[in-house]
Amino acid sequence: MKNIISLLACALIFSTVTMAQELKNLDFISPFHAEVAAVKKGGMWAFINMDGTLVIDYRDDLVMTNESGIACCEPDIARDYPFFESNRALIKEIKQGIAYYGYINSTGETVIEPEFINATNFHSNRAIVLKVFKETIGRNELLGKNVVSYSYNEEIINSDGETVAFLRGPFNLILDEKNLKTPPKIQSRFLGPNLISTKSENNTWEIQTINQK
């Protein structure tokens, strides 16, 4: 029994020392937002709580909101670090050379799979995303495969990833790495919890109210 207690004590001391080492030599520490702060070390990001405890370990898929092509928010509040809003933070996954965006919760669990070719941070439990759609338009019998086309819509999702409003689209999409080095721009922005402004093709703006869901 004494041996077990000693082993547990050693494990606790070791984990404490390890945690202290992990929080040294940091490259960047963000301000606190939603009671957590982002810390950067060696090109990877993690989150600490207000006690300085690492609550999400270092990972390489977190998205800085001023990243090129990402329409997170208004330029004056874009941040050069990841952050949480509405218990969601943006992540990125590269599939066949194309970046797809999704969200994790405050425990680091992926709650909305990376499936959007652009996405904003959440605002009052909602986010604006570019959602991809695939349509079979025929079949190439010679090659023995379906002929497909892709398009995307600009939509609003809730914190469960469900579409709650349609904004724009569909727009034709060439789904390959060369064409999507930079994601298509999101042309809408939040003015308030239920108010959205959207830029039209003639560079004017329209405002619409989004029903609560």
Predicted feature locations:
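Bacterial N-terminal signal peptides
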Residues: S6-S15
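Residue-level detector of conserved, function-critical positions
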Residues: Q21-K213
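Sec/Tat signal peptide C-region and signal peptidase I cleavage site
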Residues: T16-A20
